Amino acid sequence: IFQVVLSQRFEAKLTKKPIDIYKKLRVTNPSPFMFFFNFNDFQIIGASPEILVRLRDNKITVRPIAGTRPRGKTKKDDLYYERDLLKDKKELSEHLMLLDLGRNDAGKVSKINTIKVTESFIIEKYSHVMHIVSNVVGEHNKKFSKFKSLLAGFPAGTVSGAPKIRAMEIIDELEKTKRKVYAGGIGYFSANGEFDTCIALRTAVATKNKFYVQAGAGIVADSKPIKEYEETENKAKALLNALR
């Protein structure tokens, strides 16, 4: 096994209406994918930064995110964390591994020799964390249905690990609770055959006066446990702070 993405679940008391939490999240942590689902006995609230699989204009896109630092309290601190992230050999090697996995996933449902990395090792910043991000695009092979095209990238390597199946077996052994919504896919399918999905990250479930948030970190041979633990806390902060 090269990497396992282990997660932990945070639990808090539900102190306000779920829709009000979502409204606050839109202001405090705007993200590429914002969503609110109101079911009979629970709500899903999310602000995900990461594409799972997208099919648009006959292009398949995956956008792996791997490598995280907290945001700095000042511009100077922010720049320090950004530079520190981009020179961290462990984070860079992890990202490269997951970028290669993303290229392989997209390649399964793309025409031969059309896979391109259109963005590589860029920094994206959100309210509480910053990430290393790359973008992979391929020309969609139409012999694959939209559902098979989605499954080519599911589950994402950035929330499971590599190789995926063994990583998921270890996750099942070590995590105390089933992930349920966390790390799954949320999105839509259009009548024209296109679709867009994100990974259920920075996502909370509100039910029975409880508020659950789950966050993970990629564990490799040279991981430092305290840093990985702090990474999960930093990722959960945006949602937990929206309760206030």
Language-model features: where?
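Extended alpha-helical targeting/anchoring segments
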Residues: 1-244
